[in-house]
């Protein structure tokens, strides 16, 4: 509802821009304004998977971490700068790209479904979990390595994200989401570690 969304406090301009549009849509729907026969706004969480190497530093941590780990080099994670969160225990909802595609395909085959939906796994996992999964899929032992969080990020750094999937499930989407470990294994073994990572 517009009231619920109005209480949200984005941490950065990117989040503010997404919320502003979602709020606009919610207000239009609440006012019974004309809408297309089907419409959907999807809020993707931390998407990872194959075919994102063109994104450079904006690629997922999985894609950035693997080539370093594969060479036997450490990939340092950000230290926590909060006393109540241990190093590496910062949590994100990492969602495999195939699952995002699955939601989109489902919407395309269910023209009666419209709305704003979160698209994530519904589980918050730690960066330590992610690092361990990348090392395991790369055939390397994991030894934690740390670096300080840049000062420019500290004020707006997210310590926890987790998709609330109730609206998506109530709309009828029932497919399970890929586990972090399985998604990382597919990404690395079937794509990133292959001679042609884009096949």
Residues of each region from the PLM?
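C-terminal substrate-binding subdomain of Rossmann-fold SDR/epimerase-dehydratase oxidoreductases
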Residues: 71-199
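Short alpha-helical oligomerization interface
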Residues: 2-10
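Active-site beta-alpha turn of Rossmann-fold NAD(P)-dependent dehydrogenases/reductases
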Residues: 11, 43-45, 120
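Active-site helix of classical SDR
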Residues: 17
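NAD(P)-dependent short-chain dehydrogenase/reductase
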Residues: 23-102, 133-135
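Short, solvent-exposed loop/turn segments at secondary-structure boundaries
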Residues: 13, 52-57, 156-159
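Catalytic tyrosine of NAD(P)H-dependent dehydrogenase/reductases that use a Tyr as the general acid/base
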Residues: 11-14, 92
